[in-house]
């Protein structure tokens, strides 16, 4: 019975979350365009954030490294995957992370085994487009940058997600499990 209750809580939360995203999208776009006045990269390739772009051949391993710090911790992982012959797409939310990724992997990008991309906005259609364009085998999420839309989209589209270099201390897990709704439910 508790599994059913948990699923209902997740469904209610996701409906509410998606509705909030829909309402807040103009604010999110305003934020990106405002930031782009000082850092033009925030608004560059904006369609990527909606999951729109050119479809790529083959399947890809997705590494989600939001910012510069996450990217730095992902470097050994990306290197090992490329050594094994995997094609890797790295997503970022911040221009600093993206710029560092593009610079560090310039040779791999030109050879076509690494791509750098903005992370899609956290709603299902954007992730559905993204997962479809790259035929994602699985996602490796650095640290604890899981988002509800990302998780539910990956689950709905059978894309396995793995947490890398992240911590969810027992104390936090226990505290969260006592709440009406927690990240544990998702």
Residue ranges of predicted features:
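Active-site and donor-binding regions of nucleotide-sugar-utilizing enzymes
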Residues: 29-186
């Amino acid at each position: 019975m508790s599994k059913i209750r948990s699923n209902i809580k997740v469904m209610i939360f996701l409906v509410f979350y998606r509705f909030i995203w829909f309402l807040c999208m103009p604010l999110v776009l305003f934020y990106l365009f405002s930031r782009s006045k000082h850092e033009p990269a925030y608004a560059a390739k904006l369609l990527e954030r909606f999951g729109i772009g050119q479809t790529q051949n083959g399947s890809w391993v997705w590494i989600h490294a939001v910012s510069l710090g996450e990217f730095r911790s992902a470097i050994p992982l990306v290197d090992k995957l490329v050594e094994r012959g995997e094609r890797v797409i790295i997503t970022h939310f911040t221009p600093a992370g993206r710029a560092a990724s593009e610079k560090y992997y310039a040779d791999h990008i030109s050879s076509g085994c690494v791509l750098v991309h903005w992370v899609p906005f956290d709603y299902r259609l954007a992730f559905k487009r993204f997962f479809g364009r790259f035929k994602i085998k699985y996602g490796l999420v650095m640290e604890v940058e899981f988002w509800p839309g990302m998780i539910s989209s990956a689950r709905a589209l059978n894309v396995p997600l793995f947490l890398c270099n992240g911590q969810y201390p027992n104390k936090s897990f226990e505290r969260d499990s006592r709440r009406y709704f927690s990240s544990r439910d998702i």
